[in-house]
């Protein structure tokens, strides 16, 4: 018997034959030529048909990196993670079909996906579930065929070049799970990679051996340089761990140095005690922070990051920067070719500047020394070229208008990018708009061909829609607001000046902390995570703590002043015309800032939406430490005995509360602080070198004490601790006798180091699953 298949038009040419599976033997019949079958023996009649045969691609064309979307090696199938919907969408992208094949429900909050080079199987890292889903790709009947338990908060996935091993970064477990893709089982856990691993990349030497490669792992938050002053522009360094795929063990580490000169000047230097003047004379630096991704090209690995430039005085263009660092893979050292991508935008004409805020990830072409960096807050992708000899990257200009940087506009809050093997298409995952952009890489300049929906947005008018709009505003440097009169152009650009800055630039996209000590007007202040601003056990979210270390704000809407004075934006609180910024915005008085006339987004008040996100959309990180661990149990008992809960008790793990309806009576806020919420526990040291106010025109707050910090998910925010970072560890925090005896009227019950160690272990175990201490 024989089987005949008719020829169809394919990318290889009008007469290129299709390869189809014979259902009886599982073998391929080729094109319009015939295969004769006799007792399972195949005789090829027309050998010329071989020229059209497309064998499965079983190896990736170049190095691989972790992303929230993934392509098969032949570029025909795309997987897109939908973190807010607990699903993965599967698309046919061959020949620009860009059609949804299926949508598969996976574990809670999938953030990373991967797919075997030859297709057939995909994977998703489900952050809250603590699992990796194994997805059988079977057209419209795709499904989860296995669920693998991994570490705490799995975030990123990356496959070896031939797909034999899958590595999973467990962000809160500070570990890497190694998965054998043949058996889909965890074969090893690598535990000493450093806190909060996020970005993964694997080299590719082009052979069949996956055991001769190197895995590169970024540590999300920068590491303090012990020789520097926290709050200085060179206080910290980025860190990348190296892992051998042969041994699955850490083989080294690379530190990414601060950039000495960002190219933007300040009017003074608070750390050096040079008061602010009127001229911009003083050089500023920045260190790599928020290292979410890493990508390999040639002999270098490139790491985009939000650079922290914390020294005062404040100005919109000397706080966060847009860094791209290079690692020399041969020397395993920083190549010292870090650039500030913002600099490329600085010379552009106003008012059309758009800075490259929050460079979140990147991908390279396979056949050219060209890459694409995703600016999550500015909703753009920018192009870079790299010198393959030195590692120096250059931001490319628009060939149509060389006075401008090439900006490829995407959907809202892009967070991932992949390039196909033929370098013809790039695909960008847009987190907030829940879609992906298809970029034509063959055109000059590159352009978006299509935007394809991956998941549904919340129903308009619902609480989820309000939270989602708040998340959108929290994560944007621009903002797109309803016009005051229907039919008029949208109002844009109110969140920052020229797209420089966003809430997420300091609080991360998850509403947490960048762990930076900033030199602010109140003094040195380590960024406070917002996951404990509201009592998450209260369904009404009416219970709120006071805000900032010095309790000098009572409403989330007071941070309108940060939009204006830190990010340089015009803000969201407006006059009756619905457009003009209202200049009467202050902390405390004379007006409450909540429920004032605001810009609106799709009919929702902007600040109401941001507040809804901060109250209900920010999740407390999960702890990797079990509450049943004996040392944790002992530590909790000691915590109670020392009456630590007198300051750090309750559902928010802080006694700080907003106990009045704003605006407060003047008697409640002498010196601009809510004094009733402050505690003096020996943590203010006016002689500390970084205990300065940003403009040096007054003393820093602190003599009256600070509001008690929340202990909820404390493990997620590594040292240094306290408002100005003087304690490298929690043990150092507890070495302060005044602090540890504050709940026992000065009687020190924690003189034993082992007791303090037990309390530290308990503190590191606290998360939203821990029963609060009343």
Sequence positions of predicted segments:
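Predominantly soluble domains enriched in secretory-pathway, periplasmic, or organellar proteins
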Residues: 52-479
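Alpha-helical and His/Cys-centered functional microenvironments
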Residues: 12-14, 37, 71
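Prokaryotic Sec-type signal peptides and long signal-anchor helices
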Residues: 6-9, 28-29, 40-43, 94, ...
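Periplasmic c-type cytochrome electron-transfer domains
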Residues: 222, 263-265, 290-774
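N-terminal secretory signal peptides that target proteins for export/translocation
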Residues: 1-32
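Positively charged, low-complexity intrinsically disordered regions
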Residues: 9-11, 34-35, 52, 199, ...
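Bacterial N-terminal signal peptides
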Residues: 37-51
């Amino acid at each position: 018997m024989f089987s005949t298949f008719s020829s169809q038009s394919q990318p290889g040419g009008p007469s290129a034959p299709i390869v189809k599976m014979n259902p009886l033997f599982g073998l391929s019949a080729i094109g319009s030529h015939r295969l004769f079958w006799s007792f399972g023996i195949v005789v090829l009649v027309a050998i010329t048909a071989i020229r059209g045969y497309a064998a499965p691609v079983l190896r990736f064309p170049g190095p691989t990196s972790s992303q929230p979307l993934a392509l098969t090696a032949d570029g025909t199938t795309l997987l897109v993670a939908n973190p807010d919907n607990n699903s993965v969408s599967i698309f046919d992208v061959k020949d620009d079909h860009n059609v949804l094949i299926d949508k598969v429900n996976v574990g809670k909050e999938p953030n990373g996906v991967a797919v075997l080079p030859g297709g057939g199987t995909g994977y998703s890292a489900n952050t809250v579930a603590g699992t990796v889903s194994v997805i059988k790709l079977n057209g419209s009947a795709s499904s989860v065929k296995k669920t693998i338990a991994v570490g705490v908060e799995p975030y990123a996935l990356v496959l070896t070049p031939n797909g034999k091993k899958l590595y999973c970064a467990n962000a809160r477990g500070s570990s890497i799970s190694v998965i054998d893709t043949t058996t889909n089982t965890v074969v090893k856990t690598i535990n000493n990679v450093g806190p909060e691993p996020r970005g993964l990349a694997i080299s590719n030497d082009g052979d069949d051996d996956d055991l001769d490669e190197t895995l590169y792992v970024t540590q999300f938050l920068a590491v303090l340089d012990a020789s520097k002053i926290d709050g200085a522009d060179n206080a910290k360094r980025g860190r990348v761990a190296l892992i051998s795929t042969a041994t699955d063990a850490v083989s080294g580490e690379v530190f990414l140095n601060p950039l000495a000169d960002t190219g933007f000047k300040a009017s003074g230097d608070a750390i050096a005690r040079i008061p602010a003047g009127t001229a911009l004379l003083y050089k500023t630096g920045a260190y790599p922070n928020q290292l979410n991704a890493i990508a390999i090209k040639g002999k270098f690995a490139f790491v985009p990051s939000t650079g922290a430039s914390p020294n005062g005085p404040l100005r919109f263009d000397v706080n966060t920067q847009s860094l791209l660092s290079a690692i020399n893979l041969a020397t395993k050292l920083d190549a010292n070719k870090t650039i500030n991508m913002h600099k490329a935008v600085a010379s552009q004409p106003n008012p059309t500047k758009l800075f490259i805020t929050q460079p979140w990830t990147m991908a390279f072409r396979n056949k050219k020394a060209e890459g694409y960096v995703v600016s999550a807050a500015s909703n753009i992708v920018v192009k870079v070229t790299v010198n393959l000899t030195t590692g120096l990257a250059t931001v490319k200009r628009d060939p149509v208008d060389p006075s401008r940087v090439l900006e490829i506009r995407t959907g809202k809050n892009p967070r991932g990018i992949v390039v196909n093997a033929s370098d013809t298409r790039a695909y960008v995952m847009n987190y907030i708009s829940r879609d992906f952009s298809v970029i034509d890489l063959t055109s000059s300049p590159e352009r978006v061909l299509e935007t394809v929906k991956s998941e549904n947005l919340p129903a308009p008018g619902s609480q989820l829609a309000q939270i989602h709009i708040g998340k959108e505003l929290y994560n944007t440097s621009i903002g797109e607001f309803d016009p005051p009169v229907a039919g008029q152009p949208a109002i844009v650009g109110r969140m920052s000046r020229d797209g420089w800055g966003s809430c997420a630039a300091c609080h991360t996209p998850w509403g947490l902390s960048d762990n930076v000590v900033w030199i602010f007007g109140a003094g040195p202040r380590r960024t406070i995570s917002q996951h404990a601003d509201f009592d998450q056990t209260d369904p009404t979210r009416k219970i709120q703590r006071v805000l900032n270390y010095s309790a000098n704000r009572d409403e989330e809407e007071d941070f309108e002043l940060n939009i204006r004075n830190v990010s340089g934006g015009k803000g969201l609180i407006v006059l009756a015309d619905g457009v003009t910024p209202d200049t009467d915005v202050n902390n405390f008085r004379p007006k409450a800032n909540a429920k004032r006339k605001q810009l609106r987004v799709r009919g929702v008040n902007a600040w109401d939406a941001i507040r809804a996100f901060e109250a209900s959309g920010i999740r407390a990180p999960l702890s990797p430490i079990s509450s049943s661990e004996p040392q944790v149990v002992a530590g909790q008992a000691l915590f109670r005995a020392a009456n630590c809960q007198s300051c750090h008790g309750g559902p928010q793990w802080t006694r700080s509360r907003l106990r009045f309806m704003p605006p407060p009576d003047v008697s409640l806020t002498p010196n601009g602080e809510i004094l009733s919420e402050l505690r003096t526990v020996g943590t203010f040291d006016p002689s500390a070198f970084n205990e300065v106010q940003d403009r040096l025109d007054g003393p820093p707050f602190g003599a009256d004490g600070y509001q008690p910090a929340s202990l909820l998910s404390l493990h997620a925010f590594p040292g240094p601790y306290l408002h100005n970072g003087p304690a490298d560890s929690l043990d150092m925090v507890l070495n302060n006798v005044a602090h540890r005896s504050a709940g026992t009227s000065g009687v020190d019950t924690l003189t034993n180091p082992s007791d303090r160690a037990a309390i530290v272990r308990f503190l590191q175990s606290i998360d939203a699953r821990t029963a609060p201490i009343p």
